[in-house]
Amino acid sequence: LGASVLRVRRESTDGPVIVHLADGRSFAGDELLVAAGRKPATDNLGLESVGLIPGRFIEVDESLRAVDVPDHWLYAVGDCNGRALLTHMGKYQARVAASVILGQDERDRASGDVVPRVTFTDPQVCAVGLTESQARQRGLDVRVVTYETGAVPGAYTSGEGIKGTSMLVIDQARHVIVGATFTGPGVQEVLHSETVAIAGEVPLKRLWHAVPCFPTISEVWLHLLEGYGL
């Protein structure tokens, strides 16, 4: 953003973190999160011999083939293609590439939208699929439904005063979920059910019959669907 950090200090153990910028400004916060991103380790692989530029992400198609390599014989999976820098997505891409190579064409397309991700903070933050803004940018007519995660009986097993929000992004035309975000303790364990619902394009009226156990965080499903009007 055009700003240079001069120094970062915490005056006391329980005090705020203060970030001092080179232009004289300073900002205070409870904690400081450093997220500088990652650079692809594609140097010294001989990529230049096949027309690729070393040190950059390798652009691939939905079958994980490098698009800039003639005859598309080179596959790139995992962090090196820059699609989703997550271990589980790298493993998924490897399975897709293997199915393509073996001729199992029913699984030869890697989804770029259904990417589950978890931030292991306290409380946890997790999401899968599209955000509301991403969905609208694609021309989808979406509705957002939210519910307080801490209001679910299962949340009380983590203690009183639990805070967090659960949110669904719903495609109004197809009545399916295209995105979901959860915050709160233990919500990462709910994420896979949302991933299945999005990847399978399961209609909301079918999901209504998926009964969550009491008392678990999964009961947030019921409240979200009720909030939608089911």
Predicted regions and their residues:
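Flavin (primarily FAD) cofactor-binding/catalytic cores of flavoenzymes
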Residues: 3-6, 65-67, 130-133
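Glycine-centered tight beta-turn/hairpin loop motif at sheet-sheet or coil-to-beta transitions
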Residues: 22-24, 161
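Active-site-proximal substrate-binding core of FAD-dependent oxidoreductases
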Residues: 82, 100-131, 211-213
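Flexible, glycine-rich terminal cap/loop adjacent to redox cofactors
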Residues: 121-230
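A conserved short coil-to-beta-strand element within the FAD-binding core of flavoproteins
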Residues: 1-14
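Short, hydrophobic/aromatic-rich segments at coil-to-beta transitions
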Residues: 15-18, 141
